[in-house]
């Protein structure tokens, strides 16, 4: 009887300690809910103009600027009125390459609705336009996206002629059969703001969904891929891995064999 009486308080203490530890874990998880594997603050870092010195002096100046910042091309001209179109006050920015986060007045003349900017030089009227005809104050131009290169059969010895490289950048466009069907391959066009945009063949859409690496336009992705040196950036590259949504997904092995071949896609429609 005495041994049982001594054991009960010890069990109660351990149960109470485990309950306190579990409660503290819940509180800390709710307070510090930042996932260290999530994508870094790529969308929060201010854009950097290509050719400008790095704004950091704590060691980050040795890193690639496009890892955290959107690199924009240098502006032509020295200020407002140097060939840029005016912007009507209150309208959304006409850019989608990172410049939409910059103050519009840095490059454009801000025009109030229904008025003409003071001191702005009137553009010459086209020959077919008569005086008195209202002219548009701002123009939104849609940028054309180059179509994705056609995929070619790789063969068993494709890895011997292709070279590996690292890629990173923002997803500009998505193409391939995976854009229409869960069973098709997904091609992404990425732009790092410095080099010409490239097309990369990732994997079937169901495999990306199963691995948690679904990509969308505007996302920052990076990884490793194989490229045919005879085609350079004009051809279709083949990804070995991709990091998206904070997840790192292996897509192909060193012989360019898709890892989804042994994964199976029986329940892909349910994911």
Curated annotation (Swiss-Prot):
Q: Does the keyword Metal-binding apply?
A: yes
Membrane topology reported for the UniProt record: Single-pass membrane protein
Q: Which residue spans belong to the Lumenal compartment?
A: 32-271
Keyword annotations from UniProtKB, A to Z: Biomineralization, Heme, Iron, Magnetosome, Membrane, Metal-binding, Transmembrane, Transmembrane helix
Q: Which coenzyme or cofactor does it need?
A: heme
Question: What binding details are noted for the cofactor?
Answer: Binds 2 heme groups per subunit via the 2 magnetochrome (MCR) motifs.
- Asked if the Swiss-Prot or TrEMBL record annotates the protein with the keyword Transmembrane helix, the reply is yes
Superkingdom to which the source organism belongs: Bacteria
Q: Which residues lie on this side of the membrane: Cytoplasmic?
A: 1-10
| InterPro entries, A to Z | MCR (IPR040963), Multihaem_cyt_sf (IPR036280)
* GO cellular component terms listed in the entry, alphabetical order: magnetosome membrane
Q: Motif range for MCR (magnetochrome) 1?
A: 48-71
Q: Where does heme 1 bind?
A: 65, 68-69
Transmembrane regions listed in the UniProt entry = 11-31
Q: Name one Pfam family in it.
A: MCR
Q: What is its main location?
A: membrane
MF-aspect GO terms: metal ion binding
Sequence motif MCR 2, location on chain? 87-110
Intracellular or extracellular location(s): Magnetosome membrane
Q: Quick one: which residues bind heme 2?
A: 104, 107-108
Query: What extra comment accompanies this record?
Result: This bacteria makes up to 20 cubo-octahedral magnetosomes of about 45 nm in diameter which contain membrane-bound crystals of magnetite (Fe(3)O(4)).
Summary of the function given for this chain in its UniProt record: Required for correct biomineralization of the magnetosome, may be involved in redox control of biomineralization. May function with MamY, MamZ amd Mms6.
Query: Which family does the entry's similarity section mention?
Result: Belongs to the magnetosome MamX family.
What name does UniProt use for this protein?
Answer: Magnetosome protein MamX
Q: Which organism is it from?
A: Paramagnetospirillum magneticum (strain ATCC 700264 / AMB-1)
**Gene encoding this polypeptide?**
mamX
